[in-house]
Amino acid sequence: MSTSVSAAPDALGQALLAYQHGHLSATLAVHSSVVDEEVLPAAYFFRSLWEMPEMERTALEECRGRVLDLGAGAGCHALELQQRGFSVKAVDISPGSVEVMQERGVREVACHDIFDAALTQGEKFDTLLMLMNGIGLTGTLAGLERFLEHAKTLLAPGGQILATSSDISYLYEDEEGALVFDLNGPYYGEVEYTMHYANQTGAAFHWIFADPALLQDYAEAAGYAVEFLEEDDQQQYLVRLTLP
């Protein structure tokens, strides 16, 4: 297993390992630049097929061929796809998450950032799977633009990206429902997060929530065809991106 990760404490990975080893009440404290502290149970990363949101189940149904699961967490999607007979490579930047996936039986696991040159070692994939607001892995608008180009080196001919994201503009609504944010400032969907577990605080990281119109603009500018497969009443959506 090759790695390309920082030396910062792996709060997410440690929480998942704790759950995997029997501490079923393990929870992460998540701080962000847009909302107050949130509590994220480690159990959420271990959900079964029927505990997954409908949008995630739809994404699994739409997978085809060789799958690269990016930001795979504890491996719930990779394990489900394995059960269905898919060949899956699961990747996460968290060493603890990778260890959990190995313990749970994900057959092919690697510890990488999504931009690592060694991510696929030249292999091409039919499906790039990016769930749990997976577009966020790209971090920023610049990162999104960079990833859309990078993904072209990962996709086999006829391949697809299946990804979820959300429009978080509702966080900026005033009491009358009007949007209030600085049009000259950073894109409102760019968020900074920090995760805490036990006595560990992970390094701050950037995450992007791309509204559908923005995602479509960036993807089409990069040469992708865009198909929105599903949206829900919480402004989350599932999108398929393909190259001609």
Where are these regions (language model features)?
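A short SAM/SAH-binding and catalytic strip from SAM-dependent methyltransferases
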Residues: 125-145
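Conserved SAM/SAH-binding beta-strand->alpha-helix loop
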Residues: 94-95
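Conserved SAM-binding loop of SAM-dependent methyltransferases across substrates and taxa
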Residues: 74-85
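SAM-dependent methyltransferase
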Residues: 2, 6, 14-20, 156-214
